[in-house]
Amino acid sequence: MNPMTDLSDTRVDPYLGTVVHVVGTRQARPNLPSTGCPFCVGGLESPEPYQVRWFRNRWPAMPGDRCEVVLYTSEHEATFTSLGVAGARRVIDLWAERFCSLGTRDDVDYVLIFENRGPEVGATIAHPHGQIYAYDHVPSRPGRLLGAGWTPDADPGERFVAAHGGWSASVPPAATYPIALSLAPRHRVADLGELDDAGRNDLAALLVDVLGRLDRLYDRPLPYMLWFNQRPTDGGEWPDAWLNVEIVSPWRSAGTARFIAAAEVACEEYFNPVIPELLAEQLRELG
């Protein structure tokens, strides 16, 4: 075996500052399970019955037990929407518990909670699940966003989609993906650990609502990427950090992906064929 295949390190482009994690071992990661679903009860990762569950990733992108998998339900055919508010609340509570636990580690400066749903965005197992990466630094994008005083749009107007209690969802005005949603509490909360009982219920209801609308948009399960932006755990001062959720999909129409191509990659300027206000109108009508 070539020893280079086990290479794992972090490199930074000297001119652009881009951080690249070189993880040779992930080339050996199976694209699809060879026998049965490892996340179903009795499978490799879930020998006992469960409602929600987390475990360390067998194919981590980073060393030091800083990559985890979160199972939303034992039901293989479920969706986040079919969990209902009670099931979604269980997931949120587990997300919050893992954020608080990982965030106390000296080698963790930022906890990213995320989901890739569908093979179109890289999911290799269909069972409902998400992941957590615990970074030993604050990555550039959330650092810039949270450090710049980001706040939810107080008056999104035609870009408004839905609201539940103290949480609301709207389409961002300058979305880089054809489908994009921003979810946030109306009053500042820095991270999931600070979100109170009512706030967690409102977030659960809003996630169940908007993810259901997204699946109804094209009358089929929508591939999406979802992630939380929240206070870094590096011990620094983040007085303006405001918890928020982003959901994006590459589909510009049913089954048709919009590819981020050469001009956009080269210049980091984007061309979105979907008008945010029209997307918001469609999603409102699906409520």
Predicted segments with their positions:
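Active-site microenvironments that recognize anionic phosphate/pyrophosphate groups
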Residues: 1-127, 133-192, 198, 211-212, ...
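Gly/Ser/Thr-rich active-site loops/lids in small-molecule metabolic enzymes
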Residues: 200-206
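Extended C-terminal subregions enriched in glycine
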Residues: 206-219
